[in-house]
C-alpha cells in the first residue's frame, strides 16, 4: 500500500520491522517493483510500523524526508524521478507527466496488470507552498557549502584592523559575537 504510487520508480527498498512476526521472514529477500520489473531488497528497519497498514513500507530516499533517513542508515541509492518542474524524468516510464497525471497512469497500469487490490481514502498532511499553493515535492538537488568559520576569521580581521567600521559602533560587539559563533 502507498499514498504515492507514482514514486515507486524511485524506490530502493521495502522496509519491515524486525519485530513484525507476520513479515520478518521476508527480510533479506528481494521484491520486484511492478511496471519496471526491478528487484529491490527487503530490509529491517523500525521506520516500518507492524501495526500500520501492511507493516511493510516502500522506501524512496530521494523523494521523502523519512525515507532519506532510512536510506542513510542502510546506504541505499538515491534515484531521482523528478525534473525541476515536478514532472517525472527519464528514470520512469511516464517521463514528462506531472505527478498527478503520473499517479493516475501508474494506478491504471497496475490495474491493467491485475496488481491493484483496492483504493482507500487515507488522511494525510500534504505540504503546499505558501505563495504558490502548489504541492511541495522533495527533490534532490546539488548544494554547495562554504566554510563559514574560516571566512569569519578574515571578516573579523578587517574590522579589528579598522579597514571596515560599523556605524553606530555599538553594532561591532554584536557582529563579533555573531562571527565567533558562526557555524
Residue ranges and their predicted role:
Residues 1-3:
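Short hydrophobic beta-strand that contains or immediately precedes a catalytic carboxylate
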Residues 5-84, 154:
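Catalytic alpha/beta core of large soluble enzyme barrels
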Residues 52-183:
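Residue patterns forming the tRNA-binding/recognition surfaces of aminoacyl-tRNA synthetases
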